[in-house]
Amino acid sequence: MRPEDLARMSVAELRERFLDRNRALSPECEAALTTDPRAGAREVLRLILKRRHANRAEGQRLRHLLRYEGELWDGGVTLVAGVDEAGMAPLAGPVVAGACILPRDYRPRGIDDSKQLDRRERERLAEDIKANAVCWAVARAEVEEIDRLNIYRAGLLALTRAVQALTPAPGHVLVDARKLPELRLPQTPIIHGDALSLTIAAASILAKTTRDELMGELDALYPGYGFCNHKGYPTAEHFQALERLGACPIHRRSFQPVREALGLAPLQGELFAPPPESAAEPGGEGAIAGIAPGSAPCDVAEPLPARTPASARGI
């Protein structure tokens, strides 16, 4: 398109071509819009430049989120996994971990730590991640395991199970904040990893959306507690329900507010003490995987309800 053609287009036509259809604007046409006497035409240019700036900023942000992955890729590690968990603080329900391996060219717009996203964005991104990941998995540690091991070690168990459910297996694992002692794979713990690594952020979204969906299902089994609203977290609504109804089977008996509701004495336990020899079974229950076509699924007991498997993409 020539600059003189712009003068013959209405403002509505300019909007439709350059904003709605996102057609490229040449430097000559950009200069012509700068001096266009119509305020509406200049506004179209302002919006074009604003979107261009936002796209560049998003591209830079995503490149920044891939610096850990990039170092590993450049070092010859092809399959880099990220893993994160959701549900450490709630008074009820399991802790759920998500893990995934992403293609090198995958740049999901808007991805961030799951806590920074609203429900609709998390769900949109979760479906996109599952559709584009090399492989993905979610796993959980049940309430009984949380009460037996404590929440910290149960979180490690869920994280380990999620990574071990990935097929193909990763060559390196990026973990949010912690190291997984039962995982015999190279790994890098990253403080605030869900805000600093794209792959961990993707895993956090898988964990959060899976757990939220599960708590909605548990709300139907245990009505009156409001699990579909607070997801088991310690809110005023949850405390009122505990006082009114008492604890239900998915409440964590090792957590003090639940023990108070049951009239039990406080527990005195060392949070970071090594788990019993028989307690850690990382490859055990509670894992499902999204698997690249052609790979054998992981054999795990008591899986979560089946989810849509991931599609393979080149790395």
UniProtKB/Swiss-Prot annotation:
What keywords does the record list, in alphabetical order? Cytoplasm, Endonuclease, Hydrolase, Manganese, Metal-binding, Nuclease
Q: Which Pfam families match?
A: RNase_HII
> Quick one: a GO biological-process term for this protein?
mismatch repair
- Show where the RNase H type-2 domain sits: 78-267
Location relative to the cell: Cytoplasm
The record's GO CC annotations read: cytoplasm; ribonuclease H2 complex
Family to which this protein belongs = Belongs to the RNase HII family.
Entry protein name: Ribonuclease HII
